[in-house]
């Protein structure tokens, strides 16, 4: 902000505290920082939007507001007085770039509740999810997808997330910023979910997703599984998946008008996809490899510390 720039120019704030940092905040006190701003000042500053948000919510937490005040009815702690220590408080930069949750297996509990209270998985409900994530210093969300279509059911779901600083992705079997329900509801238009026999329509479905998310901060899930979160088939050739990813990245590049590597992507090695990877399936260097458990909490694979460095990094689902 212009205010922070004035403080930096006046030497009231050290430039290297926030410069070139990711999602970092500082909370500090200043005395007579600028002309016209006399007395003691409490300053919350961030290296970027989320850094600033985390700083505000960290102060809220230390005052006595739990991140779960809304979702779990945690009482707000009463304080007779609030004191601020001199010096600089910070959590530093996050060690993990993308930190978030997947709203999965949401029916009947959450689905029934949000339908009764908000009319569905819409922005009236998601605003509370976004706030919770930010208060927990998270930044990433895979939205509910059993019967919901995050992008289509409420056109405000995605823009609100982007405005608040939440990065949206789609689940392991929903590639190219599309929800499975979007395909299921228009199956007569798009045809069978089979890339070998219906490439043109599926590519169109993919392209529409990237066009819709263009300009927003999202992580694009790539590759493909079978229809409705099922395996593609026992005889699936890894070369088919590699070709699908090649075509998807071409679409990403065409729509965004920049190299595909400039758009964050992940490939989820869920279930049988890990077996393809073990057989030598090639993953582009810039794509995040999302390792997964076996649905029972048993981690199937960890990054090999002796393997060649993978620039795209790794995640755990």
Write out the residue ranges for each language-model feature:
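An acidic-aromatic substrate-binding cleft motif
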Residues: 66-119, 124-144, 312-315
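Short helix/loop capping segments that flank catalytic or ligand/cofactor-binding pockets
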Residues: 52-55, 110-112, 143, 151, ...
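Contiguous, structured surface segment used for ligand recognition
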Residues: 1-93
């Amino acid at each position: 902000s212009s205010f922070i720039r004035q403080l930096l120019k006046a030497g009231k704030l050290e430039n290297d505290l926030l410069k070139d940092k990711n999602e970092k905040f500082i909370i500090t006190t200043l005395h007579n920082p600028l002309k016209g701003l006399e007395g003691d000042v409490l300053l919350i500053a961030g290296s970027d939007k989320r850094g600033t948000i985390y700083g505000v919510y960290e102060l809220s937490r230390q005052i006595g507001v739990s991140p779960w005040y809304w979702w779990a009815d945690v009482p707000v702690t009463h304080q007779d007085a609030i004191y601020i220590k001199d010096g600089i408080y910070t959590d530093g930069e996050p060690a993990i770039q993308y930190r978030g949750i997947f709203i999965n297996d949401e029916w009947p509990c959450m689905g029934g509740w949000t339908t009764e209270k908000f009319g569905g998985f819409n922005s009236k409900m998601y605003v509370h999810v976004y706030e919770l994530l930010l208060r927990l210093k998270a930044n990433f969300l895979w939205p509910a997808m059993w019967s919901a279509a995050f992008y289509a059911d409420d056109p405000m779901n995605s823009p609100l997330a982007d405005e608040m600083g939440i990065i949206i992705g789609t689940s392991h079997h929903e590639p190219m910023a599309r929800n499975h329900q979007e395909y299921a509801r228009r199956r007569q238009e798009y045809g069978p979910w089979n890339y070998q026999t219906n490439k043109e329509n599926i590519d169109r479905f993919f392209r529409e997703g990237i066009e819709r998310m263009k300009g927003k901060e999202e992580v694009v899930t790539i590759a493909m599984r079978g229809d409705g979160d099922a395996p593609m088939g026992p005889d699936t050739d890894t070369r088919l998946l590699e070709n699908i990813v090649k075509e998807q990245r071409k679409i990403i590049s065409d729509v965004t008008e920049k190299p595909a590597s400039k758009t964050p992507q992940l490939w989820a090695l869920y279930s049988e996809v890990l077996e393809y990877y073990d057989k030598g399936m090639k993953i582009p260097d810039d794509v995040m490899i999302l390792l997964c458990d076996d649905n029972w909490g048993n981690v199937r694979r960890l990054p090999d510390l002796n393997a060649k460095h993978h620039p795209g990094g790794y995640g755990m689902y």
